[in-house]
Curated annotation (Swiss-Prot):
Cofactor: Mg(2+)
Subunit annotation: Homotetramer.
Protein name: Fructose-1,6-bisphosphatase class 1
Keyword Cytoplasm: yes
InterPro entries: FBPase_C_dom, FBPase_class-1, FBPase_N, FBPtase
EC top class, as a word: hydrolase
Subcellular localization(s) per the UniProt record: Cytoplasm
Binding site for substrate: 106-109, 196, 262
Organism: Shewanella denitrificans (strain OS217 / ATCC BAA-1090 / DSM 15013)
Cofactor comment text: Binds 2 magnesium ions per subunit.
EC number: 3.1.3.11
One GO term (biological process): fructose metabolic process
Binding residue positions for Mg(2+) 1: 84, 103, 105
Amino acid sequence: MQTLAQTLASSKINDSLAQLILTLADTSKDISLAVRHGALAGVLGATEQENVQGETQKKLDVITNDMLKDALTAAGGVRGLASEEEDFVVEVSEQGEFLVCFDPLDGSSNIDINSLVGTIFSVLPAPTGPLTEQSFLQSGRKQLAAGYVLYGPSTMLALTTGQGTQLFTLNPDTQEFLLTDAAMAISPDTGEFAINMSNQRFWEAPMQTYIADLLLGDIGPREKPFNMRWIAAMVGDVHRVLSRGGIFTYPADNKNPNKPYKLRLMYEANPMAFLVEQAGGKASNGYETILDITPSEIHQRVAVILGSANEVDTCLSYHGIDYREEPNID
């Protein structure tokens, strides 16, 4: 099996981007170890702090954020970074050629129950001139690389540099990421969906109708049964979609009119959309392809519908001209 370093060396990307990816991968090994130590190291539970989204930070949120910041600062090549756990963009090096956006520990609410968590990252080109928030506000089409590391029974890295989506598995004996799927491919059709059903009454009409039809199964208009899956960590749900197909969605809702969307564009939706598209799937916010959205700020949130291409198209058909109403939740 090829190692990650060997795979990157044989790809078309330049050496500096390859080195940055290796830095992210090496740091994820340390994060994996911290996650596995859990209660033994006293790192479970919450802090008394909130992040910029108003969410209570878990201890491991803060620890893993600092691990990535320190590694990216020491590595060189990074102009600046943006994180779910940082209020503002962080300047790293004036000579850096890359911007890195990341969610250091996606699904951190799962930590205390020993369930799936992961790290999500996105790499963008750094524009010339002073570093500001505006430097980061590039559409997902500009991404040079994206990926996630899933900390589960195995530690796995899903990666794309625009040449397909590849899966690597960490060998616990050698601490090397080994290529275990050279070309991940999402089946176009599926019988699985992932959604947080507790918000059903707050969704827009198109999504309510779409999910209701899935639940009717073979006695409804879809004429086949569907199973629901929900891990409560985007990284876990998207990994399942990449591995065996499916549709994952976190739609707009009016539960809190001031926060109609849950997932962050820059360091959750964009990297996952890049991975999914490179594996033959599709990703949308219901009305626009996610990778075509121009961000307005680094912590912008969006609705997300991604996965098996035909099923995403079917979901989007419910958002067509006969269904679409401008939401009252902007």
